[in-house]
Structure formats: structure tokens, C-alpha cells
């Protein structure tokens, strides 16, 4: 008897991966499929390798990022495996594995805790097993075109659907944030009429507006509105008008009544299918950047900032253009006071930059762009009119609230070299240079508050009185890198009229008669 048991034990070889039935019964299995035990019990169709339990440190790693196993799971299954067994193995897999292989929806973990990721992923698998949502290919959900794939192809496992899902997956692997401002035609188009009487000759020439400064000139408007900005858009609107010559009748058509007011809902209708389970987080906002604007936010990701910026930003030409603009705007007495304030910090800038190499200057520009990208994430959420400019006064960033407050658009201020002093009145410009010379190197508290600051609008004679807070941001070398200005409008309360004063006095008299002392 002992010899017979030893022969059976010698014939039975242990395997690394047991089948589903043997693993459930906790018995020894074989490497061949179907195994001997499943054949005896009539379970050949379900005799497949049991799925491996994922390690805890791999619980939050997506399936496509897992390391490739050195040995496949069914390598021990011998070459004599029939087609029926292969079909049984593919059919016994869970629905989530089939849809994942075909490029269907996969719920990725979005929590910072591994335990929470494991718990919610398990609940998601239980809830979404064998549902219609899991059978919708990724190409249908994230396709930007207006003609999605037909339902017959979407719900089938054909090669075309799999190929479309692979293409959509490659698109999803790319950076999802697109540049909204790059889709506009020419940035010179918005500057018509805002550069003075020589606007047409300036825009028709090939002069670089980022190196040669042309100041903004507010326009005199009779009705006091921003209608002069819409004259250039009249041709585009006229093309959309529908007119019937036979009855001399115009038909209503969609037109933008206030083009200077941004519409937050215009990017929502993108032609894609929306599902609440696949919605993005609300903190993912659209980054507004332009790679052809060297002074503004040029890229939308940190990787692009650190890899694509290969030259420093030149502040010297900006300082020279700023001095020329001050000479053309102010009188001699005011220029002496401003130059005295500039002379207090300008030599320090030059002396601090003497020992810096070109690599240091490139790193300073990368730090500026990275800080500006980080500030964009919360400036768009606070809702306060905000403007950011460099240490030479050149504007590099502004939010929508600042555009609504002043009347200037983002393209008008950022599509050329524009200084913050162009948007301030004379008294505010004088206070600006005094404050800058005081905070730049004398006072390192980093912020300054101005109770009164008057902003200029595109309409001549129209100003906005504000109370502003300026914050200085320094780089790693201690030099002022950027100034962040928050502007809050001062709402003047109307003086009480004579009738209101008489009514208040009558109320006081009647109250005194009714309650004698």
C-alpha cells in the first residue's frame, strides 16, 4: 500500500497556478487544463486558471501600467489545448476584464488612500458588472466629432470597435488641456483703433509688438459705451444675417450682443456624450496660455515649461521702453521724481544680475512661468480682479474679473508690450514708483496696500476708482520676480437728497412728541 501511494504522489506534480474549482476547494491542482479533478466532476468548461490576487502596493496602479509578467499564466498548459478550452477560458473571465481588453470604460482610482481606492474600486466592479455603461467604448464617450460610432458597432466586440478604442486611448494619453486662445485668428485684429491715429500703418507693418512699444490710446466715445470695439465685428455678424429680398425682411439669427463679456458656457457643448459616472473633477479648469506671447503664460504643464523654455526673458528692453513712455506722457518735474525712485532700485538689479550666468537667467524664467501657472489655478477661483506684471512693469497675466472691471480684454493687453502704468492715472503712477522703490529692497514685508488707485478704461475720461493690494514675489536670488495686484472697486454712496433729509427730521420730531422726557 505504501508503494502505491508513493507512486501516485510521484505522478502528481504541483502547479503554481490552480484552477478556479480547485482553488475554491483548497485542493491540489495540476498544470494541465482541464485538470483530472474537474474531468471527474464534469467541470471541464469552467476549469481555467484562478486570477491572482493583486498585491497591496499595486492596488492603486492601473492595469495598463502593471509590469509584464515574465511567464504567462497559461504557459504550463501544454500545446494540446483545444479551441473549446480557449473559448471557455475567455468566456469565464469577468465582464470588467473583457471590456478593459477591448478599450472600454475602466474606473481608475482617484483617492490618495490605497485602502479607499481598493474599497471603492471593489464597489464599482460590483455595481457596474454586466451593465450597458461598461459596454460603451471609450471612442464614443471621448470622441470630439459630432458623428459618433453607430450603436451596432459600439456594443459589438468587432475589430473596428477595438481599433477605435485604441485610437481613443492614445488620444486620452495625451495632455487633455487644450489652448483656448490659440484657436483665435490674429491677435492684431483686436488692436484696431486702440493705438492712436497710426493704428492701421502699425498693424499693417511687420513690426514686432512685443519688442517695440506702442501705448494704448483710449477713444473718445459720444455715448460712453464700448460699441466702438464691435465695429470690426460688424462684417462677421452681417454674414450671419438672413435677408429675404422678395419681402424685404430680415430674420433673427444668433449674435453676440456683448463680446467683451466672457461666456462660461460656450465650451460646454463640445459634442461628446456625458455620463455622471465619468465626469471630471470640478477643480480641472481650462488653462489660458499662448506660446507665442513670450511675456505671458506660455505653456500649460510644468513639463513643457522645464523642457521648452531654453532662453531667458529680456527685461532691459522693457525698462528702456518704459522710460520712453514716461518721457512722452509726463512733464519734467514728474519725470525727475520718477527717475529718482527708479534710480534707487535699478542699479541694484544690474549689480545682482552681473554674477548670474545664462543658465541662471533661464532658470529664473522657468521659475516665473511655473509660479504663474500655479497662481492661475487659484486666481480663477477667488473671483477678485487680479493683474500680474513683471518687475519692469510689463503685464503678463490678468483674469476675467479684471477685464470686466476695466473694459480691456485679455488680447488687447497681452498681444503686445503693455505696462501697468498705462492703465493708471498720473497720481497713481507717481505713487506706484514710490511704493516700488520702497518695497523692492528696503522693506521685505512683500506687500503694500494703496487706499486709492484709479484705473483707466478704453473710453477716454472714464476711470475706475479702486483700492488695491500689491504683493511682491521674489525669486531664489532675492530679486523681485513678479507683482500680483488685486483691485477692488470703491462704490461711492450717493449723497442724501433734501427730501430725504426733511423726512428724517419729521420722523425725529414726531418721535420726540410721542415720548416726552
Swiss-Prot record:
Pfam families, alphabetized: PAS_13, Zn_clus
MF terms in GO: DNA-binding transcription factor activity; DNA-binding transcription repressor activity, RNA polymerase II-specific; RNA polymerase II transcription regulatory region sequence-specific DNA binding; zinc ion binding
Record keywords: Activator, DNA-binding, Gluconeogenesis, Metal-binding, Nucleus, Transcription, Transcription regulation, Zinc
PAS domain location: 371-443
Gene Ontology cellular component list: nucleus
Localization of this protein: Nucleus
Keyword Amino-acid biosynthesis recorded: no
DNA-binding region residue numbers: 19-47
PROSITE patterns reported in the protein's UniProt record: PAS, ZN2_CY6_FUNGAL_1, ZN2_CY6_FUNGAL_2
Coiled-coil segments on the chain, per record: none
UniProt GO BP: carbon catabolite activation of transcription; carbon catabolite repression of transcription; cellular response to starvation; gluconeogenesis; positive regulation of gluconeogenesis; positive regulation of transcription by RNA polymerase II
Cysteines joined through disulfide linkages: none
Chain spans, region Disordered: 66-103, 144-166
Keyword DNA-binding: yes
SUPFAM superfamilies the UniProt entry points to: PYP-like sensor domain (PAS domain) (SSF55785), Zn2/Cys6 DNA-binding domain (SSF57701)
Primary subcellular site in the record, as a coarse category: nucleus
Described purpose of this protein according to its UniProt entry: Transcription factor which regulates nonfermentable carbon utilization. Activator of gluconeogenetic genes.
Family listed: Belongs to the ERT1/acuK family.
Name used for this protein in its record: Transcription activator of gluconeogenesis ERT1
Source organism per UniProt: Eremothecium gossypii (strain ATCC 10895 / CBS 109.51 / FGSC 9923 / NRRL Y-1056) (Yeast)
Name of the gene this protein is made from: ERT1
